[in-house]
Amino acid sequence: MTPFLLGYFLGSLPVAYWFGALRGKDLLKEGSGNPGALNAFRLLGPVPGLLVLLLDLFKGVLAVAVGEGVSGSPLGGLLGGVGAVWGHAFSPWLLFRGGKALAPGAGVLLAVDPRLLLWALALFALLTALFRRPYRAVFGVALAMPLLAARLGKTAAHLLFGLGVGLPVAFRHLKDWNR
């Protein structure tokens, strides 16, 4: 439980929101209303947007490392990564509003196994070409994440990891289905 909670805390840190506040912008009320890297890029410019993206990616990587370090087991890393994605999507700092969790999710996948991130990106490209709607493609990748992770790790823990990472991402993208 400790790796998940530590990951949740790291993921919950609303980096984009804080960058916006430093510039006098409320990312929850401006642009898309999403406290994430893309809205930061659009409202604050490319440099702050890129910094937010990198810091959000780092939150995911760090959560996996901390989870594994605290537990002494790769399973702790999986739990820490899941916690980071849920923390970003449902941040207590923002009254449980949060980002779409793509950047920390990508960091988690990168830290767990870079092949998992590559598979997710390849599936995203394929689904984007098919649907011509990136939000639907992200939703599809999020729903496929349990199968991708289980194929990689071949364990029930990896299946549950994929479910834990995919569910909040799918949930946060559901409202954008028609975009």
Which residue stretches match the model-derived regions?
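Helix-loop-helix junctions within the multi-pass membrane cores of secondary transporters/permeases
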Residues: 36, 40-44, 49-50, 54-63, ...
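Interfacial segments of multi-pass membrane proteins
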Residues: 41-44, 67-70, 87, 102-131, ...
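Alpha-helical transmembrane segments within multi-pass membrane transporters and channels
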Residues: 9-27, 51, 130-136
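Alpha-helical transmembrane segments in multi-pass membrane proteins
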Residues: 3, 7, 12, 16, ...
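Short, non-helical or kinked segments that cap or interrupt transmembrane helices
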Residues: 26-36, 93-106, 133-140, 144
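Loop-to-transmembrane alpha-helix initiation sites
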Residues: 117-119, 134-142, 152-166
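Cytosolic, membrane-interface loops and tails of multi-pass inner-membrane proteins
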Residues: 18-49, 98, 178-179
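C-terminal ends of transmembrane helices
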Residues: 16-21, 87-97, 124-131, 170-179
